């Protein structure tokens, strides 16, 4: 009896790469003469248009039940290998099957004409059967599988096909094998749904690379480290056609609901899909009718078989009497006639604080323009904003009494801020706890020109030059002192010789006095800046600068104390070389402290010092404190129009935030890892790209604000580097022979305590950062939290740099330097990825990259701490 050959359909185009291979196009029907011909796994011998050749089997689909009426012989192709008997195995057991017996010409069976996507189930006739496990259809990927090299040698299959155990295609073996000629029906064919003709997927990731995540995956904290949960990274919720899925909690995104569902089935659709505007007892809850995206239509008179009508707008008018299934399908009803409806904060996760329930302004949140008087280009008047203003329209300030009474008439409303705002203290805190605090507002330009009683503020350019000169003076004098005294580990130091000789007394005294003088001059400059900070628009700048100044004051007092001990003790019996060592150890940290103070002043120079005015045609004395209105108006026209005035703490609860659109990026860009010139260049490029963030500034909850303030205090706490007053928790025990010296061990133990204390702060900052990202906070929030992470980790970099300079052992210096450089590189990466995540918000891939960098930083800081502990115990 002649066995007809099975037909196969081409799923992809194929270009022949050898003379023995067939070329075909997608959709061609060809006759399969032999599978795995001559032992070539995956290569089938086929006939197409009268020509025979081998083709890659993974680019074909067997047409079940369809055979070639005119059987085609093997022809000139390679001869088929005779089939071999297959050992008896129970059903469901996978065993290697010889290729010739695994795929053989199919026996004729009775069948009815069916569609191309239905498998036939012939009547079983044998007791054993050979099993071949193949993947089920998955419409997730569209790239054709790679074909194997067209050689005639035995090869291993190019891909392995993992699939669930239920998707088994039972291919009948050869005629000589005691097997069953049967196909098992796949699970999807029995439910009557369409089967997609898509090649099998190799894994949850395709040939084109990793699919970008649809949601940012935040690691969870385990002990002191952070790990990703494996279950979260494998959730592919969008790769199955929706009509094949039952309604469930996964239907939460951008697809309108299906008609005919009950009201309680809409609870999970909480994002971008508005509910249907249905009135009457059978309609949906009116509390859910919020936004302006057209939902699907729900008609009670239609059958439930109709699905997902998209193009009928929702109802806007709510002033008609309620009736059964009454719809208002119109857009032209003014919002003022709409019925007020309560605001449900659970429907909007980005709006953390809802307005009061009795407020009538909660009705039309986004699609109603603000009142006409709220314009940006009109100076504010005496009108106070009403409760219905829900936009970021600047509130009007209360004018000073003399303006309200009409005694002073002045068109320059932006030139000088009212005294009430410039002098009155406020309890409001700004959200950003940056190292710069540079805020651009309508008051910043004018507050620079306010003269402090008794002293004239320096011009901006002169102040910056003086600051650089003072910082350089501190570094130069300290370097001269260290060169004179010499490091304890240096070969040329005064203690490195066999007979230690102290440096000359006069030279040492002059070097110490020079250090004192340089630090004192820098402190005087900083004190003047602190005085200027009381008159800036940033209410927190004075407190931040005062903390930086106090840190430098403590360093200066320590230098003075050690210098006095050195002067009074030299030549006396009580003087020891350790006194000089303490002075040297204290002096080593002075340049770094001066650099931090100078960096802070440099970043806020535009707020602390007076801008250089452009020369005018009038006399030099025209720039007095109280110019006439004409001069003031001309000065306003000569500079750019300032941004709208800020909210006051009494006007709005979000008074903690800056009103400048680019203020958060300006605060964030300068974190002591980037120069001011580079910052100004990149800042201009960023702001020219357009709107970095247009959404309103959300209001933090009380708990988040408390956490933010606590982190700000912890991050601003300076590192204790006074080794002279430190006593170890346990007495120092001598290490093993050939280990660290006592000075290195004491140094490591001292900074190990500092490292552990700062690791706690860093862990808290990372937790708060991950919480902000997981709750989808805007860039204003997560950028501020990332600054806490960066500043906390920067303290560990400072500890590593200090240890690498002061340690004597080469092994300690090399390991500490390695981890310090690693942390510094990670911080640069976090700065770059955070900028990208803020600019591309709400891109999940950019945010995920930022989260991964912070997670890597957490692991590296734990390794740094362990290395310090191991070195101290050596």
From Swiss-Prot:
One of its GO terms (cellular component) is membrane. Expressed in olfactory sensory neurons (at protein level). Expressed abundantly in the liver, lung, brain, and at lower levels in the heart (at protein level). It is found in: Cell junction, Focal adhesion; Cytoplasm; Cell projection, Axon. Residues 73-88 have a biased composition (Pro residues). The modification Phosphotyrosine is found at residues 132, 238, 253, 366, 376, 414. Residues 71-177, 374-394, 409-450, 610-662 are annotated as: Disordered. Residues 139-155, 621-659 have a biased composition (Polar residues). Residues 119-420 are annotated as: Substrate for kinases. GO terms for biological process: actin filament organization; antigen receptor-mediated signaling pathway; B cell receptor signaling pathway; cell adhesion; cell chemotaxis; cell migration; cellular response to hepatocyte growth factor stimulus; endothelin receptor signaling pathway. Its main location: other. The keyword Metal-binding does not apply. A motif (SH3-binding) lies at residues 639-647. PTK2/FAK1 activation mediates phosphorylation at the YDYVHL motif; phosphorylation is most likely catalyzed by SRC family members. SRC-family kinases are recruited to the phosphorylated sites and can phosphorylate other tyrosine residues. Tyrosine phosphorylation is triggered by integrin mediated adhesion of cells to the extracellular matrix. Dephosphorylated by PTPN14 at Tyr-132. The keyword Manganese does not apply. The modification Phosphoserine is found at residues 143, 296, 432, 441, 643. SMART domains: SH3. InterPro entries: BCAR1_C (IPR046976), BCAR1_SH3 (IPR035745), CAS_C (IPR021901), CAS_fam (IPR037362), Serine_rich_dom (IPR014928), Serine_rich_sf (IPR038319), SH3-like_dom_sf (IPR036028), SH3_domain (IPR001452). The modification N-acetylmethionine is found at residue 1. PANTHER family: BREAST CANCER ANTI-ESTROGEN RESISTANCE PROTEIN 1, CAS SCAFFOLDING PROTEIN. Docking protein which plays a central coordinating role for tyrosine kinase-based signaling related to cell adhesion. Implicated in induction of cell migration and cell branching. Involved in the BCAR3-mediated inhibition of TGFB signaling. Belongs to the CAS family. Contains a central domain (substrate domain) containing multiple potential SH2-binding sites and a C-terminal domain containing a divergent helix-loop-helix (HLH) motif. The SH2-binding sites putatively bind CRK, NCK and ABL SH2 domains. The HLH motif is absolutely required for the induction of pseudohyphal growth in yeast and mediates heterodimerization with NEDD9. A serine-rich region promotes activation of the serum response element (SRE). This is Breast cancer anti-estrogen resistance protein 1. The gene is Bcar1.
